From Swiss-Prot:
The gene coding this protein: fusA
GTP-binding among keywords: yes
Protein name (database record): Elongation factor G
Keyword GTP-binding: yes
GO CC aspect terms: cytoplasm
Domain of life: Bacteria
InterPro entries: EFG_II (IPR041095), EFG_III (IPR009022), EFG_III/V (IPR035647), EFG_IV (IPR047872), EFG_V (IPR035649), EFG_V-like (IPR000640), EFTu-like_2 (IPR004161), G_TR_CS (IPR031157)
Function recorded in the entry: Catalyzes the GTP-dependent ribosomal translocation step during translation elongation. During this step, the ribosome changes from the pre-translocational (PRE) to the post-translocational (POST) state as the newly formed A-site-bound peptidyl-tRNA and P-site-bound deacylated tRNA move to the P and E sites, respectively. Catalyzes the coordinated movement of the two tRNA molecules, the mRNA and conformational changes in the ribosome.
Amino acid sequence: MARQYPLEKFRNFGIMAHIDAGKTTTSERILFHSGKTHKIGETHDGASVMDWMAQEKERGITITSAATSVTWKDCQLNLIDTPGHVDFTVEVERSLRVLDGAVAVLDAQMGVEPQTETVWRQASRYEVPRIVFVNKMDKTGANFQRSVDSIHSRLGVKSVPIQLPIGAENDFVGIIDLVEMKAYFFDGGENENYETKEIPAEYLEEAKKAHNHMLDEIVTFDEAVMEKYLDGQEISKAEIKSCIRKGVVSSTLFPVLCGTAFKNKGVKPLLDAVVDYLPSPIDVPPAKGYKVGEEVQIPTSDDAPFVGLAFKVATDPFVGRLTFVRVYSGILTSGSYVINTTKDKKERVSRIVKMHAQQRDEINEIRAGDICAIVGLKDTTTGDTIASENQNLTLESMTFAQPVISLAVEPKTKADQEKMGISLSKLAEEDPTFRTYTDEETGQTIIAGMGELHLDILVDRLRREFKVDVNVGAPQVSYRETLKAKADVEGKYIKQSGGRGQYGHVVITFEPNHDKGFEFEDKIVGGKIPKEYIKSVKAGLEAAMNNGPLAGYPMIDIKASLFDGSYHDVDSNEMAYKIAASMALKEAGKRCKPALLEPIMAIEVTVPEQYFGDTMGDISSRRGMIEGTESRDNVQVIKAKVPLSEMFGYATDLRSFTQGRGNYIMQFSHYAEAPKSVVEKVIEDKAKKNKTA
């Protein structure tokens, strides 16, 4: 089957923003105006196409990233709408990893908000080119220039308006296109019809000034155009667009557009900008792959061998396990086999589907540069590389934040007990920031995630999708443990009980590995431990790390280097080395200065000025570190870092001392060593809990 659209006509892009900036409404208008849907779905009445989960429709928020494909101006646009709530940043992270561009949506009243900063940093980490859409220009308090200024002040990047609003709030009627130097007046109807007119006289001077500012900023991306500009020659519209595109593709220029998606003003010009300025798969640098000891470039070509990255796993009620894949090179056909090079496992591609939110269109093949979902991959999880059988390389995987909050779940009946384990495993497959494990001391099943809303949604899904009824305990802080000192530690397991025995012997260097997770290094030389047992040593360490030496919390940020040991020709086996490794880690827990780590949250509190002092004092009383304050429209905004353990009940307290006029948002920042008083209390509480279990 021939390619329907050439690679240069592809746009893989996402919509990203702070919660309530209007991402999903913008996505719904894109679907409607591109002809993908014939009725506009609204988030506020639960009719959104992209927010298809029951929980999304009820709460009016996006929880899972939804993918769809639309066409606009002879281009195929693969669009992913991502969540804005901090608890679901994993969805943003894995979407940005595979996208070539993004539209950052801002609320025209609020400008850049805290979650905007978070998703912007995520996009910068993957060097994703972006354009900015200042939405809700019809909202009371909307201010385009202030929103543009907030991009400079809070994101620290070069943003250049390529449109200006005509009016604001209830008087927002259209936009000025600074490239074409024309005005578009919208009729407000759902088809977003607009009249193109000359720029009104009262806006002409401002438009000329903004046009010249735009030229000053963009000509630097093309030497020939810059020479023309400096010589006083006129720059053509095609040259202007070319310069903007070069700046965007290089991730150093961020054009700003405006409109109101809900009132159908500005979405069609936004779609034009996606086509004109965001890159195609061949405009961005080729993906990097890793073979043993070398880095290789993966050409974006149908003629190259197939290589793809699994960026999401979802459970579909009709077809079962769906694996979302970005294809970087080659062609994949349904019924073929691939190798999961991350896990070294062969997988069969039963079916390939293109997704439209939760709907599926089956296709026979998928080609380089495209995004699809695959049915039939049993062992492939988020971050895994799949490739044709002769490709022994892996793509860079993804790293995800550790869970910060946990709670116990208990099945209500024996039938629920049997279903719960399988259901939790499926949810954990879908969501890399969700963990489930059994507390060895109490026997309770613990689920852990990124926030109370995150766990609330997962418990709701357990009940609705998987029909598992559970009792839920109170939320608890997910502490972590680590080692602060370096030591060489021996683990030796010998068991002789008639017949064949057990023998495993390892010597491991344990040391701190700050912010780098668990790292295992095989330094065995001379065959002191046979190669087939090395993986068992690593597996034994990983299992033992689930139960730290201080209070039984999972261990993180440790490097383990296996450098010595021995084996027995008859008695050595995988289990013996797993046990020996766990014994070594247990001993390291005594000798390497174990420490308890607590999750630290970044909070931003907004209060009227008269409550500023009380709020500052309250944050300090919670062991908070104030990082900065600023005034915004008669309110004070306080940024601080506070331990999560001190934030339970904060919403109620804040409402109380601000008479309901204060609000805050909170997101995970990092893990930090807990003070001695906290360590003692955590150990004491854990001991009491284990006693009563």
